[in-house]
Amino acid sequence: MSQTIDKINSCYPLFEQDEYQELFRNKRQLEEAHDAQRVQEVFAWTTTAEYEALNFRREALTVDPAKACQPLGAVLCSLGFANTLPYVHGSQGCVAYFRTYFNRHFKEPIACVSDSMTEDAAVFGGNNNMNLGLQNASALYKPEIIAVSTTCMAEVIGDDLQAFIANAKKDGFVDSSIAVPHAHTPSFIGSHVTGWDNMFEGFAKTFTADYQGQPGKLPKLNLVTGFETYLGNFRVLKRMMEQMAVPCSLLSDPSEVLDTPADGHYRMYSGGTTQQEMKEAPDAIDTLLLQPWQLLKSKKVVQEMWNQPATEVAIPLGLAATDELLMTVSQLSGKPIADALTLERGRLVDMMLDSHTWLHGKKFGLYGDPDFVMGLTRFLLELGCEPTVILSHNANKRWQKAMNKMLDASPYGRDSEVFINCDLWHFRSLMFTRQPDFMIGNSYGKFIQRDTLAKGKAFEVPLIRLGFPLFDRHHLHRQTTWGYEGAMNIVTTLVNAVLEKLDSDTSQLGKTDYSFDLVR
């Protein structure tokens, strides 16, 4: 092999060398693999409308889910509270998955522990694991809050978190001064957004259940983001509220703990919503739920426990949605919209005008969580784009109906199709049969782009990376997608993807380069 200390190749150029190619050929002979022609025949068949029809008749099988499980969301919610240690009651392997998932997205260490239930706990229950786990976690990591969620193992055998935690405190395994909110988060129903919602309900019950709040006693607003992984969105919310001189509390704010500096000091806990902020939440003017399709239990808490209206707002993604949020904040707080925000809005409108000739009429397929997909679809319509294929694996029929209503109201949405309870293998079929210009989604879409390219350059559907997770590109999680600032970022991302593809399509010397222009 030609690997030397002076010339070290990574796997891509290394495995292209003759000796490795020969090794692969010899290995393939032992695998009893189908010949290349048969593989190509089957691949071509999976790109057809006939295969799509079979694909959509699947009932008991998910291939490449476009969602994750509940405890993942519960962990993210917990990370947003100050001095809080996420604690998962269940399998250690599950927690390794959650930590790895967030490690790869945020490029940060993720503090999260498990009480490592194994075979004996699966038979006799996990009470002993809970006792020892809470004792060790509090002694080793000195948290002020331990936020407990569950994996499938604990849920299948029916472990009672409330009783386990109460007994652990009574028996002295964990100090009574440590708050232990909890949520049942079974992975076999719902998704990561459900887990976030359930965990937030657990925090609300722990800190406010015994408090009779007085809405409006404090002249501030509460903002609840739901499952949100763009750290810039937390910062832009705080900036906009500060510019309007509106006091606010972001209830669950992980923007510091998931973006700590490299200065020689490890911060297991950094920033986050304090216990006092959570306790005072019922005294705020109102609580705005910024991703309402995923925050059903949170809405119930706000309206029934805190006696606040939970004034309806949509995810603040795009021009009109940000307008609506700021007007709602102004109405509730009595504060005018800041001149700086009006100026920022004007810049966004100018950008939309500058780029409309390249974005108008472009067809997009997109997938993701319900609120994100609805917000992005709305913004695409504002830009004159055509979102022809829209898929959300974890959405419901009410969401689908609301999406169709929004699409029918726009001339750019009348040819759109909305799919729910469908996975990325369904989406793959749709990319072949509908052939949009681009797809928008998380990193998993790169495999669909690769497959469309394998059919031929004319069939390629390039991926524009927006959403979660983003494993294969760096630092995108720090960006902003909400507010006018976020809309500017999205316009920039979309139009430059269009122009990159145009440059690629017109770069053949003497053949297509008559449109390989310097100015776009």
Swiss-Prot record:
The keyword Cytoplasm does not apply. It catalyses: N2 + 8 reduced [2Fe-2S]-[ferredoxin] + 16 ATP + 16 H2O = H2 + 8 oxidized [2Fe-2S]-[ferredoxin] + 2 NH4(+) + 16 ADP + 16 phosphate + 6 H(+). Keywords: ATP-binding, Iron, Iron-sulfur, Metal-binding, Nitrogen fixation, Nucleotide-binding, Oxidoreductase. GO terms for molecular function: ATP binding; iron-sulfur cluster binding; metal ion binding; nitrogenase activity. Pfam families: DUF3364 (PF11844), Oxidored_nitro (PF00148). It is an enzyme of class 1 (oxidoreductase). [8Fe-7S] cluster binds at C69, C94, C152, S187. Its cofactor is [8Fe-7S] cluster. The keyword Iron-sulfur applies. InterPro entries: ChlB/BchB/BchZ (IPR050152), Nase/OxRdtase_comp1 (IPR000510), Nase_comp1_CS (IPR000318), Nase_Mo-Fe_CF_bsu (IPR005976), Nase_Mo-Fe_CF_bsu_N (IPR024564). One of its GO terms (cellular component) is molybdenum-iron nitrogenase complex. Gene3D superfamilies: Nitrogenase molybdenum iron protein domain, Nitrogenase Molybdenum-iron Protein, subunit B, domain 4. GO terms for biological process: nitrogen fixation. Its EC number is 1.18.6.1. It comes from the Bacteria. Binds 1 [8Fe-7S] cluster per heterodimer. This molybdenum-iron protein is part of the nitrogenase complex that catalyzes the key enzymatic reactions in nitrogen fixation. Tetramer of two alpha and two beta chains. Forms complex with the iron protein (nitrogenase component 2). Belongs to the NifD/NifK/NifE/NifN family. This is Nitrogenase molybdenum-iron protein beta chain. It comes from Klebsiella pneumoniae. The gene is nifK.
